[in-house]
Amino acid sequence: MQYRDLRDFLAQLERIGELRRIRVPVSPRLEMTEVCDRLLRAEGPAVVFERPADGAQTYDMPVLANLFGTPRRVALGMGAESLDELRDVGRLLSALKEPEPPRGLREAGKLWTMAKAVWDMAPRKVSSPACQEIVLEGDDVDLSRIPVQTCWPGDAAPLVTWGLVVTRGPHKKRQNLGIYRQQVINRNQVIMRWLAHRGGALDFREHAIAHPGQPFPIAVALGADPATILGAVTPVPDTLSEYQFAGLLRGSRTELAQCLTPSLAQAQLQVPAGAEIVLEGHIQPDPAHPSGYQHALEGPFGDHTGYYNEQDWFPVFTVERITMRRDPIYHSTYTGKPPDEPAVLGVALNEVFVPLLQKQFPEIADFYLPPEGCSYRMALVSMKKQYAGHAKRVMFGVWSFLRQFMYTKFIVVVDDDVDLRDWKEVIWAITTRVDPARDTVMVENTPIDYLDFASPVSGLGSKMGIDATNKWPGETTREWGQPIVMDAAVKSRVDAMWETLFQ
């Protein structure tokens, strides 16, 4: 599906029955979460809440939710028509990440065509962007005008969830795009929860070292087009900007707007020109804090793990200017025990990961991140095993290949006769092909998800690899079991007589 911006995408979804409008009042406090949770579990449509209201408080701004509630809508957002086509996106990324030298004129021509397609999708800056049709400054900056969801009963405050955070480090040629949740703490401030290894946090750290005591500029785009949002969570090669990749997905160049705040413009921060809402501002200095910048205690919030997370200190982003389109739409979601939108995204992005992994490890037959494992904490790999110890090589290869797998706690490797998408098959392989002492690999003191309260230390924990492949000589001295398989001729004869057996 090709589209210009979020509104064009929503119009196309509505035409094919993938979006519904809710015209009765629904509260952004808890009620929207419950509605969307039921819709997502039923594989229902995206929704626009046209009359958000919380008690006596009403909002003029509609709320878009459950946009990525099915794998098909994720695929449509990435310019594909089905989940299967996302493998092609992965093949494109693998070719861009590690292009192979052409072996002849025909392959050279294909390489040139791909390079030209990437070049033609370079983003372009526009002078009168839709995202700046309305500009709020000074006392008019008030986040309470936006119907930000409070998702769960124990949440500390309303939480911005789909904010596309744009930063640039002092020594970086390109901007970083990231999705980080933001706790609203007053009319013009949010807590920016980014983990230490994420691009935004790294840019901030480099800025604090290079320019201590100077405000750090940030822009947050709310209601960006799906391709740009999904580009921010996809393993785009370092040689390609997320905006350029979004153009490839969408089928048209990404249009960008220069931020209006002078320091943000000086930092060359650019946001999607068609974004519904843009927050411009800074993380301000605070000499009293050890980091030299304002921080606040964030959380607790219900998270994609299905639990409330611990509180921790994160930087405070002060919003100094809000720009928006006329009649803006606020894009929101919730996170909770799978399935939720991050889990659905994980299912879709899984198809993108497979060709990337296969390019590096041709022996991998399939790869699956089960959504029940919080989308990334468990990985299943099937492989064409070629030698003793091969499964362990694949385990460590997966852990180290993409940043997205840094927090994967469990990897189970099976032979290619096992269907990874069928838990019955996986459990059968584990229980029949694994000796716990011989086939379990434990790795201690590795980076782990900050939200993983099961780890002994925040951000540092262990990983487990399980080799559930058939064992080769050198791995066992015993005669290995042969799977029971019915004779093909017998199966064929029974197929032919099946309809007559029960007449």
Curated annotation (Swiss-Prot):
Swiss-Prot/TrEMBL catalytic activity: a 4-hydroxy-3-(all-trans-polyprenyl)benzoate + H(+) = a 2-(all-trans-polyprenyl)phenol + CO2
Subcellular location: Cell membrane
Oligomeric form and interacting partners: Homohexamer.
Listed cofactors: prenylated FMN; Mn(2+)
Keywords annotated in UniProt: Cell membrane, Decarboxylase, Flavoprotein, FMN, Lyase, Manganese, Membrane, Metal-binding, Ubiquinone biosynthesis
Species of the source: Ralstonia nicotianae (strain ATCC BAA-1114 / GMI1000) (Ralstonia solanacearum)
Keyword set includes Flavoprotein: yes
Protein name (Swiss-Prot/TrEMBL): 3-octaprenyl-4-hydroxybenzoate carboxy-lyase
Gene (name only): ubiD
Family membership noted in the UniProt record: Belongs to the UbiD family.
